[in-house]
Structure formats: structure tokens, C-alpha cells
Amino acid sequence: MPRPGKSSYSEQKPPYSYISLTAMAIQGSQEKMLPLSDIYKFIMDRFPYYRENTQRWQNSLRHNLSFNDCFIKIPRRPDQPGKGSFWALHPNCGDMFENGSFLRRRKRFKVVRAEHLASKSHQMIHYFHHPHNQTKMGLPPSEGSPVPSLGRLPHFQSYNIGNISGNQTSGFKHPFAIENIIGRDYKGVMTGGLPLASMMHHLGYPVPSQISNMVSSMWPHVGMMDSMATMTVPQEYGHFGVPMKTLCHGPSQTIPAVPLPIKPTASLPPVSAIPSLAVNPSIMCPSPPAVAGTLLEPAISQPENKSSMLHSVLVHS
């Protein structure tokens, strides 16, 4: 189909797409780039059909400029008068139209997204603002600001992971650490020397001789309690099977609060009934007589109260 002349499109719509009209205007310019206003002016001067309903087709043309890779936006230089950016054709889209005819567009031009957009923009500005480079079809190598590598951010400093871990472990204590689990009364003992060795000593685990000597020198009550014989438990309490150690000590000796673990037996036999409990003062810690008397008074006076109440009930009945 021969290319129609200018006079044959008087009032009818020309058979060109908006991409073809824009490319026609850009290629017809001297610098091969035009602002948006000059593209509108070229189309209206060449095709009288577009002199009406300007707002409708101009919106469509702007949409094609923004969403087609064959057009690139060139910022205006400070020394150039006017406002708005320039629009130009991508240097690699020369074969977009078949045989140079704007009526036949071979394919839609696509730019590979893997290209660095920053470097491409710099190359396009350099290409279109220097006329001696326009004769080349390929882009010149970029000389100037190097593009930073994608796999590395230069503004981040390298940190020593070993130092970070060391600082965190020295200043941070886990909430489930032994110092946080035990009560307040035991914190002084735990921070005063060898807490692990003392607890192993209480639990009966073998402790090296050096650590055992240090424990005995720092906490003499630990060896004292282990050396004292285990108290005898009455036969009626044999079902419970809980070994008890004497904790009595002299009034002049001060013993820090140390947790004493209790090791219950694996299984307990069923207890049908507990016999009458009798208080044996010999297994208790020595205490003043006045305190012992006050403790035994309720146990002695209880049978007398029961017998008097029974007698009063029989009399009134």
C-alpha cells in the first residue's frame, strides 16, 4: 500500500496509530527529540482531523508515551529554555516499523528489565544531548558515575560477628538462668563462690577434691550437715520414705540459706490409716521450756475438753 500524501487526509482520521504519529513527529525533528507540546503541534499541523477533540486524543497519546518502551523521557538541561521533558525514540527500536512505513509496525518494542535503569538514563541523556553520538546505533560506553553492584550495599559497614556475640553473652542473662530461677535469699550464696559445686555436694554427686576443699572452706556448714548422722524416723512414718537431715546448729553459728533438695522414693505404698500421732520431743531441735510447754498444752488439754463436753451432753439428755 503506497504511503498516502498529506493532501489526502483533509478531514478524515488518518490510518496511523498514536505510536506511529509520535514516532513520525520525533523523527521529523532536527534533534530527534521533542517536548510533548511540539508533538501535539506536529500532529495537528499535519492532520487536520486532530484539531478537534484535542483533549481526548492527547490523553491517549500521553498514555502511549508512558507505557511503551520505544519512547524514553529525556530531562531538559538547565541551559535550555521552556518547561517539560523531551521525548525521544529508543536507539534500539529502529526496526520497529517494517520498511520504514509507519502503517506497519512489525512488533512491539520491549526493553529487557535486567538493564540498569540508572545507567541507561545517564546514557540516554548523554546520547541525545550530544549530536555527534546520534549517528551511532549502539549506546556508547558510560564514562562517569559507576553503577554500584547489585549484590552489595556500599553504605553498610562490615561488623565482626564474634564481637557482637561476645558482647551479647557478657551483658545478657537468659530469663531461665539458674540465678533468675532461684529465690532472692539464695542469690547471695550463688554469687559468692561455687554454687554448682555446693549443689552437687548436697545432691551426692562426686565432686573433685579441689572443688570439695574450696566448698568446705567457704561453707563449713555443708560438711557439718553431711557428717551428722541421719536422724531415726519412727516406724509409722516409714511409708513416706523421705530422708531427713538435722538442721539444728548452735546459736553462735550463722548459716546462709542454701536450698536442700529432697529426694522422694520412686513409688509410695498405699497408706490405709495413719496411727495416732505422738510428739517425741527428742527429735525436735532444742528450744526453751516455755516454748515447748505452750506447744504441748493444746495436745494435753484436748482429751479433757472432749470428756467434759460428753458429760454435759449426758446430763442434759
From Swiss-Prot:
One of its GO terms (biological process) is regulation of transcription by RNA polymerase II. First expressed within the dorsolateral ectoderm, except for the organizer territory. During gastrulation, expressed in 2 ectodermal stripes adjacent to the dorsal midline. With the onset of neurulation, expression shifts first to the neural plate before settling on the bottom of the neural tube, on top of the notochord. Expression is then absent until stage 35, at which stage a pair of cells in the fourth rhombomere in the dorsolateral outer area of the rhombencephalon show expression. The keyword Transcription regulation applies. InterPro entries: Fork_head_dom, FOX_domain-containing, FOXB1_B2_FH, TF_fork_head_CS_1, TF_fork_head_CS_2, WH-like_DNA-bd_sf, WH_DNA-bd_sf. This is Forkhead box protein B2. SMART domains: FH. The keyword Repeat does not apply. One of its GO terms (cellular component) is nucleus. SUPFAM superfamilies: Winged helix' DNA-binding domain.
